[in-house]
């Protein structure tokens, strides 16, 4: 199984630099992104053969995660159940028959 995790630091800018070609070339079974920095409806990716799951931050241009998987999961949960953290779109958990897959974009270590 091939897993890829990529902090894109803004998916819209990444798309203009050839993201979709690189995505196809890498041919991962599960591909996760952190720091997507987009809102629902701002990005439409054509990724045939993949199921797409997004967790958007409430704040525009901030954090956000996504997972693209060839196999459809049994369930998908956005967040960890703590509203203060979940509004930032930092976690997606996918349940598969034999394992759980979690992508996380963690905050930096600043004092706030």
Language-model features: where?
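Structured beta-strand-rich core segments of catalytic domains in phosphoester-bond hydrolases
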Residues: 37, 43-111
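N-terminal, active-site-proximal structural segment of metallo-dependent hydrolase catalytic domains
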Residues: 1-47, 57, 62
């Amino acid at each position: 199984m091939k897993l890829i995790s990529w902090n894109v630091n803004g998916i819209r800018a990444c798309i203009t630099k050839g993201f979709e070609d690189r995505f196809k070339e890498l041919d991962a079974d599960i591909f996760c992104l952190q720091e997507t920095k987009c809102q629902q409806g701002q990005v439409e990716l054509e990724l045939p053969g993949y199921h797409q799951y997004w967790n958007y931050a409430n704040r525009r241009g901030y954090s956000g995660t996504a997972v693209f998987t060839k196999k459809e999961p049994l369930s998908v949960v956005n967040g960890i159940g703590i509203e203060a953290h979940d509004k930032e779109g930092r976690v997606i958990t996918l349940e598969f028959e034999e394992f759980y897959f979690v992508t996380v974009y963690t905050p930096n270590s600043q004092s706030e």
